[in-house]
Amino acid sequence: MEELVINHQRVPVTVRRSARARRLRLQIESDKPELVLVIPRYALSMQIDSFIRKQTPWIEKHWNQALKKAAKRPKRNQKDGDTYFYFGETLTLKLIPSLSWKPGIRVDGNNLEITLHQATSLSDGKKAIKKTVQGFYKKKAEEVIHDRLQFFNEHYGLKYNRVTFRNQKTRWGSCSSAKNLNFNWRLIMAPIEIIDYVVVHELCHLKHMNHSADFWKLVAETIPNHKELRKWMKDNHYLLSYT
């Protein structure tokens, strides 16, 4: 880990040397946040220094944006009062002592209630909370997305094979050439219209494995406001983190 100082601001930098990279590249990892500098294997120090100087305005602008987003992201310590997103709504974590060693979880109004054995230690409790919420999110995402796939495919009548769910850093859905669909279970934190958009987006890739005009025309048959929803994802995706 290194750092840059730009306009009296310390910017942490992770340097990644890549045999496949053809040029110097910068990106902001908003989850941390940090600046990532990708360097081709044979790049010279003078080339790197010159590149960073030229990119200073870009770094300053996007770093400040990343800091603002990080400040809005919920801070979770796996304790009472933490906030979680569920279908775009904010739920407050409420811990309830129990005599059962098996944690329980349910949504009650604006609360996300988790029951833990009353003798659970602080460290074990934090691990149990994180695991329980993750399992809850994944289970609900599978239920909802399977249901929405079936609903929208009544219109499209397309054939797909396997449907899988993962926790991916930046990808919300994908469609393979083998007609397998993959979805990020963190979508369960987004409003239902966003979930629907991602579901339809991947369904339409079964017919058009590109983002051509025909692809977007197919999406618009059921999601006419897809541009608005894409913008929401671009502006708010960082809120759908689970750490």
Per-region residue spans from a language model:
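Active-site-proximal or metal-binding-adjacent scaffold patches in catalytic folds
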Residues: M1-Y197, L206-T243
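Walker B catalytic acidic pair
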Residues: E202
